[in-house]
Design a protein with these regions (language model features):
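Extended polybasic, low-complexity segments that bind anionic RNA or targeting/receptor surfaces
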Residues: 1-46, 91-207
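A short, flexible low-complexity segment enriched in Lys/Arg and Gly/Pro that occurs
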Residues: 31-68
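Glycine/serine-rich anion-binding loops at beta->alpha junctions
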Residues: 54-90
């Protein structure tokens, strides 16, 4: 049975909670996690790179010099790749790098990432993450109080503008929501801070 402590935003211990074995207690599958992280990064690529081939560079229609008799190497165009201002050989063009992975793999990877964090004791559960107003200093003090140092992923059950604004200017801090949590963000973080409502949502969806 997996259990972890529950804290309030001041860092005070207020109880403990049981974690679902199906989500936080499986044997992590590192190969699937690797595949899903690669997929996430590929899907994030803009793919807008572009350069001109010799056919697309303007000019170069006239032969620079006659074919024979000059003693120089034969040339057909000043826009050939070996010329300054010439086209690019195999010039990169805009392309879509995204690809899909099956749902089973994505779910297994997420549970593997969460289980790995649980095994490292890197999950911090908060009773409720709530900010009355956007206050970066107050939010930073909260993270410090609960021991969330370094790269931290804060997960709430629903979007909260005050929480997002409070955390977005803290280096290494990322705020996300339980329904859009992804493997890359979990793997990239040193600590995972989530409130009880977010934990319930994750367990309901993935258990």
């Amino acid at each position: 049975m997996l259990k972890t402590n529950v804290y309030d935003m001041s860092g005070k211990l207020v109880g403990e909670i049981e974690l679902s074995e199906a989500v936080f207690g499986i044997e992590p599958n590192q190969a699937v996690v690797h595949d899903v992280v690669k997929n996430h990064l590929a899907n994030c690529r803009q793919g807008t790179q572009s350069a001109l081939t010799r056919a697309e560079v303007s000019g170069g229609g006239r032969k620079p010099w006659r074919q024979k008799g000059t003693g120089r190497a034969r040339q057909g165009s000043t826009r050939a790749p070996q010329w300054t201002h010439g086209g690019i050989v195999f010039a990169p063009k805009p392309r879509d790098y995204s690809y899909t992975l099956n749902k089973k793999s994505r779910r297994l990877a997420l549970k593997s990432a969460l289980s790995a964090k649980a095994a490292e004791a890197a999950i911090i559960v908060i009773d409720e993450i709530k900010m009355e107003a956007p206050k970066t200093a107050k939010f930073a003090a909260f993270l410090n109080a609960v021991g969330a140092t370094g790269k931290t992923l804060v997960v709430t059950a629903t979007p909260d503008a005050n929480v997002v604004k409070s955390g977005r200017n803290i280096p290494g801090c990322e705020v996300t929501f339980a329904n859009v949590i992804n493997v890359y963000d979990i793997v990239n973080a040193s600590k995972l801070v989530l409130d009880k409502a977010a934990l319930a949502t994750i367990e309901e969806v993935f258990a």
